[in-house]
Amino acid sequence: MSEVLVLTLRTAALATLLIVPPGLAAAWLLARRRWYGKSLLETLVALPLVMPPVATGLILLKLLGKRGPVGRWLDFDVVFTWRAVVIAMMVMSFPLLVRTARVAFEEVNPRFEQLARTLGASEWRVFFTITLPLAARGIVAGMLLAFARAIGEFGATILVAGNIPGRTTTLAVAIYDRVQLGRDDEAFQLLGVAVAIAFAAVWTAEAFVRRRHEPRHS
């Protein structure tokens, strides 16, 4: 179990960290800008939430396989490696981070940003000194939800990464494997770990959201 747990936590943490830069960029664009193609980006971001995870995994398999456009371009194997696990987790958890961060950015009073601009601050400085700190709690909540989603990812992972013990067998895949083998006791033990991690992540995320909406007293 420890090997499965360590692999799952490492890949989920890496996937969460890797989606932060593009996730925040997408969330900020959706929250603060009106531009041609915005609705297309909104749709693309939401797709992994509504598509069957296995369908997403099949798309990744075709893209990342040795005969796929991305696979041919890369000089190393991706499919059926821990890299495929990370990519599947990234794709499936990306929408949660974007949606949560977008709400956090939208709740930042634009007057603060405008005031900083009138004082000569650049867009980058406004973002890093005004927008980002004020939206930080919501962003952290989004990261926690994305991490929890990555921990529970199964459909896309099993298709693009498979079930290779010690290399691609994550917590969700291990639960499925134990059930298939009739080892229900082990499956329920793994299930308990998965539920505990998910509960802790969601509870903490909700705590950040609640604190963000609490009135501040001087």
List PLM regions with ranges.
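Membrane-water interface segments at the C-terminal ends of transmembrane alpha-helices
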Residues: 1-106, 130-155, 178, 187-210
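Short coil/turn motifs that cap or connect alpha-helices
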Residues: 36, 122-123
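Short, conserved catalytic or interaction motifs in soluble domains
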Residues: 49, 110, 162
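Glycine-rich helix-loop "coupling/hinge" segments at transmembrane-helix boundaries
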Residues: 61-62, 156-182
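Membrane-helix/interface signature in polytopic inner-membrane proteins
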Residues: 102-113, 123
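The alpha-helix within a helix-turn-helix
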Residues: 116
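Glycine/proline-centered hinge or cleavage motifs at structural transition points of membrane proteins
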Residues: 119-121, 133
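Short cytosolic juxtamembrane segments of multi-pass membrane proteins
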Residues: 209-218
